[in-house]
Amino acid sequence: MIVYVSRRGDTLLSVARRFHLPPEELARYNALTDPTRLVPGLALAIPAPSGEGRREIVVAACADAALFPLSAGEAMRYATFLCSLSCRMTGEGLLLPPADGELVRAARADGAAPLLCVANLAGNGAFSADLAHRVLTDGCVQDTFFAQLLSVLETRGYCGAYLYLMYLYPFDRERLGAFLRRAAALLHERGFFLLSAAPPRESGAVGKAHDYALHAECADWVVLTTYDWGNAAGEPQPVSPLGAVRRVLDRAVEQIPREKILLGVSNHACSWTLPWRLGQEASLMSNTAAVNLAVAAGAAVHFDEGAAASRFRYRDDAGVLHELWFEDLRSFLSRFALVREYGLGGMSLWTVNAPNPPLMSAQEELFTAAKLI
């Protein structure tokens, strides 16, 4: 694959001619909805043979069953695990799994082991430290939780669980450790896989409840959720800045065996209104939608080399100014390079509901997804 960055004066037709491709194929390969327009700064994927050997890795693809099928079906061919988002828990230890029967069946048909992603999400969809605290501390509630979890896994065709416990109280660190040990014992005894999510340590109080070494002791693979610096509640910045991701990896490999680490890779973009004020929420969209928005708005794209992320500014229909950060092909290739450089076990894609042909093509060119079922 070749990466071509569009310049002022380029058109899709001129770029296609340069690389001897039909313009329709180039547009399809890059998920461009308007093949008649192009803006400067876009990283375009150009099909070409790669001289690099493919390495087998573990790929955990996360998908929201409510949005299936979209592109999740295609992603399963390139995935080891298909993590179904998300099963909520209650303060009584009950589980509220998603209606994902079709997703689970499709995953199995493509050789992707379906996992149930269980998160401490409250009824409003936000992470709740109080909810997690109750499950971690009340023995009866926790007994109910694990009885429910095993029953759901066994009756709905899952191959295991992905525990996504986030924004916990720092003082629940030891309780989380005991919970993970119990989860590992119960699931492994029954032949289930266990993945666990661990936030970046530099995320302050958010990460203090998590012991990387203990995650490694309990889980088959540990997912580093390195895709939340630029988020809906914060100020404009890259979603997954390369320098910050590298710092997280430098610490993580000291406590987690490299082959157990799955690097979180974001497939979403954030758009903030300007001027930004504390309390404003950004809107989320797919990276592909961000590219097409830049084209529609006629906005030049600027690539931040240090962050390996792209941004542009545009005005919406009401004339409001926005700044949008997204991941392009250069971003994905830089993350894939980290997987190789650090000798990681693989990566976790958050999420695969929105189509992203350049991402899938680059992954297929460099890696082979291990198949465990």
What are these regions (language model features)?
Residues 1-21:
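Primarily a LysM-type cell-wall glycan-binding module
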Residues 49-148:
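Glycan-recognition patch characteristic of GH18 chitinases/ENGases
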Residues 57-63, 80-84, 114-118, 161-163, ...:
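Hydrophobic faces of well-ordered beta-strands that scaffold small-molecule active sites
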Residues 63-77, 138-154, 204-213, 327-340:
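Short, acidic/polar
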Residues 83, 144-175, 221-235, 348:
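Active-site groove signature of glycoside hydrolases
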Residues 91-98, 173-296:
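Substrate-binding surface in catalytic domains of secreted glycosidases
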Residues 117-132, 267-335, 364-373:
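Glycan-binding loop/region signatures in secreted carbohydrate-active enzymes
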Residues 335-373:
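Acidic/aromatic/glycine-rich contiguous surface patches that form carbohydrate-binding/processing clefts
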